[in-house]
């Protein structure tokens, strides 16, 4: 849809030159920081020596994942030099990876339908107690639930993210970590920090779960 807007100069949403900051995890960090939301330290994967230097700074474990990826696909939790070597042996050569310090946190999302002026028409969120990365890598069961009342801190960072990224006329799914322990440079236990943005609804049956949880119809809200 961004290409169509660009080709026909439609100004109701993102154009093609906006795509990098909403698709690449490394590009998102600038706009989270602009919104005053903490982000994990990162390193763009280059050489083994370059990654070792980054790990020396932040310590094990670290996470390596495609800079442009979804659903924790081909994501590695690296806890030792041996696992780092395994990552370099198994990573896709044509894919750009980002490496980040590991964060002990619970995923809290901000899900909202944004109008043409960048104002939320509907807001909710979900909590994922189990790490999506672990679910994918360990083939575990997936578990998450829709919150009845969106926490004030998630609402605050969600709205700040809307403004920073310049979101209009979208159904969005923004992900944040709620820290499970104090983390130097990121915050205290219970604080909220950035994970990633998705300029689309949360996947699977989540829109239907939202409808049941809130006795609403997000499809109708979006259509209106």
Model segments located where?
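Short polybasic/polar patches that bind polyanions
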Residues: 6, 33, 56, 163, ...
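ATP-dependent carboxylate/phosphate-activation module, predominantly the ATP-grasp catalytic core
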Residues: 101-167, 171, 178-182, 186-189, ...
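Short glycine-/acidic-enriched loop or helix-start segments at secondary-structure transitions
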Residues: 1-3, 73-74, 109, 206
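Active-site nucleotide/adenylate-binding loops and adjacent lid/helix of ATP-dependent enzymes
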Residues: 21-105, 115-119, 141-156
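A short, flexible beta-alpha/helix-coil linker loop
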Residues: 11, 68-71, 200-203
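ATP-binding N-terminal substructure of ATP-dependent carboxylate-amine bond-forming enzymes
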Residues: 1-17, 49
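Short, acidic/turn-prone active-site loops that include or flank metal/cofactor-
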Residues: 16-21, 127-128
């Amino acid at each position: 849809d961004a290409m169509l807007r660009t080709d026909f100069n439609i100004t109701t949403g993102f154009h093609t030159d906006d795509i990098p900051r909403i698709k690449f995890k490394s590009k998102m960090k600038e706009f989270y920081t602009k919104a005053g939301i903490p982000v994990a330290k990162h390193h763009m994967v280059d050489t083994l020596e370059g990654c070792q230097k980054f790990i020396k700074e932040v310590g094990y474990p670290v996470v390596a994942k495609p800079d442009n990826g979804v659903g924790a696909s081909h994501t590695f939790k690296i806890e030792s030099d041996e696992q780092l070597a395994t990552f370099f042996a198994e990573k896709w050569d044509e894919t750009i990876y980002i490496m980040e310090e590991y964060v002990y946190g619970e995923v809290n999302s901000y899900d909202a339908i944004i109008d043409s002026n960048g104002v939320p028409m509907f807001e909710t969120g979900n909590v994922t107690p189990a790490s999506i990365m672990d679910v994918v890598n360990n083939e575990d069961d997936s578990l998450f639930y829709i919150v009845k009342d969106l926490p004030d801190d998630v609402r605050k960072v969600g709205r700040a993210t809307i403004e920073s990224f310049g979101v209009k006329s979208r159904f969005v799914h923004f992900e944040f970590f709620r820290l499970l322990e104090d983390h130097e440079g990121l915050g205290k236990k219970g604080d909220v920090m950035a994970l990633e943005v998705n300029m689309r609804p949360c996947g699977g049956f989540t829109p239907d779960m939202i409808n049941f949880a809130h006795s609403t119809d997000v499809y109708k809200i979006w259509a209106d």
